[in-house]
Amino acid sequence: MSHINNYIRIFITLFVCISVHGKTKFTDRQVAMMIPKYFARDHNAPKITRTRVYGENGKKILHLNIEVNRNRYENQMEYALSAMASVSQHAARPFDTFVLIMEQNSRQVNDEKVEAKAKCTIDHFVFKRVKNDRWVKKCLNVEEI
């Protein structure tokens, strides 16, 4: 009887250890290197011109510059933010903010800077917990630069 109890304890201990450490976490550098690979999977993805991870005012920021086509502007912005959310959820330390610089391919239109709260954006794109209207109002800030 004591052997069975010992086996049960060992099994439970192993199960807890595996479940706690089951999700792989990546460094900031690894996350930054995964973004271009994510974009390479889709031939309609916008072109990436810069990827950075940095800290500012105690916040961790994932920064991405993309070239956008004004005909597919909305889709390219959402694609880039979705990619940032999908990849960054695997970071060892979570990001606070996503910064997306959209460089226009037309000189008549100004470039735009999009700042999005990372947790809210991940909840919107990955877990589908935040509806689009709420995400746009509460989590997103778009300004011309």
Label each residue range with its predicted role:
Residues 25-68, 93-145:
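Polar/charged, Gly/Pro-rich intrinsically disordered segments
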Residues 74-94:
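Short, non-transmembrane amphipathic alpha-helical segments
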Residues 25-29, 73-78:
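Soluble non-cytosolic domains of exported or imported proteins
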